Amino acid sequence: MQFIQEKAIGSWVEMDTVIGTPGGKVILTVDFTFCNFMAAFLLDSKACANVSNVFAGIKRKFRENDMRFGDIIPLILTDNGNEFSDVNAIELDLDGAKETSVFFCRPMRPSDKPHVEKNHTLFRDICPKGTSFDNFTQDDVNLIFSHVNSIVRNSLGGKSPYDLFSFTYGKKQLPCLASKRYRAGKLAKVHYC
């Protein structure tokens, strides 16, 4: 927290993975704490290279849209799982300059990243624990998390995470994070969960 105060960082992201079935596909989740907007990426496994590839792809998309990754994601808080062990792949931009900072939670302390853990419960309302992600596509994951991001929340003053994220950063960033807005009446249980 000292780093956050010293650098005057107003917002950071919490990162985690959601397990489907043991040995199967997993979902990498990135939660923007100020509004609980969550980006999610389907991975073939918890291998570190898969996480590195996702971050390289996000950074490319931001650059193609004349945006700087570190302006949107200045700090990442995550656990010390092996999938997050290539810190350089996460922290450095495509040219090798440091663009963000990664910090690790204390072992066995999910309370250190409460926002991402809370949003996982909303995901589990759609896809209960034990659901296999092996037949999911990235489009399926985008749809599910677009639904999660469209839920209006009292804690956000009657707004959705999508609304606050797009108000803060503009809608230009949303395609980089593969999210769409759904009206509350259109939220429905996804058929494959």
Question: Which residues does each PLM region occupy?
Answer:
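Short small-residue beta-strand/loop micro-motif enriched in glycine and branched aliphatics
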Residues: 36-41, 104, 129
